[in-house]
Structure formats: structure tokens, C-alpha cells
Amino acid sequence: MPSKRKRNPLQYQTSGSLDEETNQRSAFPQIDNNSASESLEYDIPLDGLDYLATVREEARKLVPFVAARREPETRETIPLRKLEIEAGKKSFDPFLRYLLNIIDKEGERLEQYMESSSLDASILPKNLQQWRVYIEHKAPCWAILAVVDLATVLEILESLSSWLEKDAIDLQSQWIFCFCYKLPELLNGEDISTLRSVLKSLRSTHTSFPALQMSASALQAVLVYRYGQKDLFQT
């Protein structure tokens, strides 16, 4: 059995004296310098305190260096940073806001009409089939928009993509735009999901008709800015 190495007792304390270079106390136990020098002569592995003594001894032999002072950045020295903007978002954003502004203003006019006029719900079409015929032949009017409820608006919008006819698409597009006036500031998740599906259908149907795509953009503006559907910027 190999004999154990005799080691000199080390004198240490848990809080060392101030270091001349850093003006701070050592975080490790303070070891006597003579003991450290003796430990360096051994070829066998050092124990924990001997290792610390070795590191201290080597650190004292290192050539000191001076770090260059970094000048604070000024307006002239800060490099220009390229803004990362999604493709098309920069130019498309003002257009959606413009449409939303129209919707907000017309929505206010509709509310004023509702407050100042006597409303008659009996003039409304009775079912979806009657709504389909009505929308194909008549332009939107305040009297109808004032009395139609949100549930009916959502139901019509959900059906409109399958009702679209080339001969009636201009009138149908007007109704889509005007139905946006009826959309409230707050809407539950299920109804928002319905509107997202409507937008997707409009974007994939009759894409060569500017009036229809304009109305789809109006719905998109409401979804993006009023209901926080930011992923629809480029839909």
C-alpha cells in the first residue's frame, strides 16, 4: 500500500487580508505563502487547499495588463440599425387604418341615426333566403342596418361567400363593408373565429373584383386593430 504523503499544516482563515491589486478580501481561505511554495514542489496531485495555494502563486507571477477605457456611445458613434419590417407590412398598414377610420366614423353615424329615428324591425327580411335576394338587389340603407342584430349579421357574413354572383357582386360587396359598422368593440372568441373564416373565404373567392376585395380589407382592418388578430396583416 503506497504511503500517504505528509503534508505541512496550513494556516488559513475564512476571511483573508486585503489583496493589494483588487483591494478586496479573498473569497477562499487565506493560505500562508511559505506553505504554498512547498506544495509546488510535489509531483503528486494536490489536495484542495494546496491547489488554491498553487493558483494564487501562479496568479502573482502573471504579467499585469491594463484594460482600455471604452468611450461611451454617442449619437454619432451608434451605428444605424436596419428596421426589420415584414414584407409589405409597412405599406399595407396605413391602408388598413384608413379603412378602420371610415368604419369607425360610419359606425358613429349609424348610432346617431338609431338614437334619433324610430326603428321598425318589421322591414327586415325574415330568413337567410330572403336576405340573399334582398342583398342581391338593394343597396344598404340606415333603416335596415339600424335594426339588424349582430347574430344575423354574423350569419349573413358567414353565408355571403357562397351567395356571390358576378352580376350582383358590387351590391354584395357594399353590404359586407356596411355590416362592419355593426361589429362591436368586444367580441367573443367564437365570433372572431367566424369572422376569420369569412375573411379567408372572401380572399379566395372572386379575387379579380376590386370592390369585393376592398370590403374584405375592411373586415380585415376590424379583425387586426379592433380584435387584435395581428397575424392577419398579410391575409
Curated annotation (Swiss-Prot):
Which superkingdom does the taxonomy of this entry point to?
Eukaryota
Q: Which residues carry this modification: Phosphoserine?
A: 117-118
**Entries under Pfam families matching the protein:** SIP1 (PF04938)
Q: Where is this region: Disordered?
A: 1-34
Q: Which Gene3D superfamilies match?
A: 1.20.58.1070
Q: Where is the composition biased (Polar residues)?
A: 24-34
Looking at the UniProt record for this protein, which Gene Ontology cellular component terms does it annotate, in alphabetical order?
A: cytosol; nucleus; SMN complex
- State its location(s): Nucleus
Q: Which GO terms describe its biological process?
A: spliceosomal snRNP assembly
Q: Which UniProt keywords apply?
A: mRNA processing, mRNA splicing, Nucleus, Phosphoprotein
Q: What is the first-listed, main subcellular location in coarse terms?
A: nucleus
- Subunit structure, briefly? Part of the core SMN complex at least composed of smn1, yip11/gem2, gem6, gem7 and gem8. Interacts with smn1; the interaction is direct.
Task: Report the protein's function.
Answer: The SMN complex catalyzes the assembly of small nuclear ribonucleoproteins (snRNPs), the building blocks of the spliceosome, and thereby plays an important role in the splicing of cellular pre-mRNAs. Most spliceosomal snRNPs contain a common set of Sm proteins smb1, smd1, smd2, smd3, sme1, smf1 and smg1 that assemble in a heptameric protein ring on the Sm site of the small nuclear RNA to form the core snRNP. In the cytosol, the Sm proteins smd1, smd2, sme1, smf1 and smg1 (5Sm) are trapped in an inactive 6S pICln-Sm complex by the chaperone saf5.
Q: Which family does it belong to?
A: Belongs to the gemin-2 family.
- What protein name is recorded for this chain? SMN complex subunit yip11/gem2
